Amino acid sequence: MRFSISALVLGLAATVYALPPGAPSAGGAGSGNGVGNKGNTDVRFSVPDNMTVKQAQAECGDQAQLSCCNKAVYAGDTTDINSGILGGTLSNLIGSGSGASGLGLFDQCSKLDLQIPVLIGIPIQDLINQKCKQNIACCQNSPSSANSDLIGLGLPCVALGSIL
């Protein structure tokens, strides 16, 4: 009986030790996005701090609109162990092999407009990081609506930081 209780206590201690660390406190070490420990932890592709809204819109081009997205879901992020002569050849060709960053689906996006200053003589440069603290994305101009779709993909978006 003593052995089973000792084994149980040892097993519980090993489980507690193997658990990942708890979430860091707000503003503490590890609460940022890995780039100088600042910003939102959901932002995977950050943009430079000195980039303006006008520069970001130019990077998106005329076929896409600059958007600020509250939610991003990333699929992928896998490490594959392939065996055999041609193991993993197909997945590496389509870009889903080891180290693939996965597909980012953005949701709850709002358009970021380039505002015209009221005082014409004073140039104002709005920094993109001051306008949007979440995921900054270039969303395709599309008249489609995904409100009643099963999958719900109306506006395909690409993270701005991934194309810089």
Curated annotation (Swiss-Prot):
Disulfide bonds join C60-C138, C68-C132, C69-C109, C139-C157. Induction: Expression is repressed during growth in liquids, whereas several days of growth under aerial conditions of solid culture induces expression. The keyword Signal applies. Keywords: Cell wall, Conidiation, Disulfide bond, Glycoprotein, Secreted, Signal, Sporulation. It comes from the Eukaryota. The keyword Ribosomal protein does not apply. Glycans are attached at N50. Its main location: secreted. GO terms for cellular component: extracellular region; fungal-type cell wall. It holds the Pfam family Hydrophobin. Residues 1-18 form the signal peptide. One of its GO terms (molecular function) is structural constituent of cell wall. It is found in: Secreted; Secreted, Cell wall. Coiled coil: none annotated. Self-assembles to form functional amyloid fibrils called rodlets. Self-assembly into fibrillar rodlets occurs spontaneously at hydrophobic:hydrophilic interfaces and the rodlets further associate laterally to form amphipathic monolayers. Aerial growth, conidiation, and dispersal of filamentous fungi in the environment rely upon a capability of their secreting small amphipathic proteins called hydrophobins (HPBs) with low sequence identity. Class I can self-assemble into an outermost layer of rodlet bundles on aerial cell surfaces, conferring cellular hydrophobicity that supports fungal growth, development and dispersal; whereas Class II form highly ordered films at water-air interfaces through intermolecular interactions but contribute nothing to the rodlet structure. Belongs to the fungal hydrophobin family. This is Class I hydrophobin rodA. The gene is rodA.
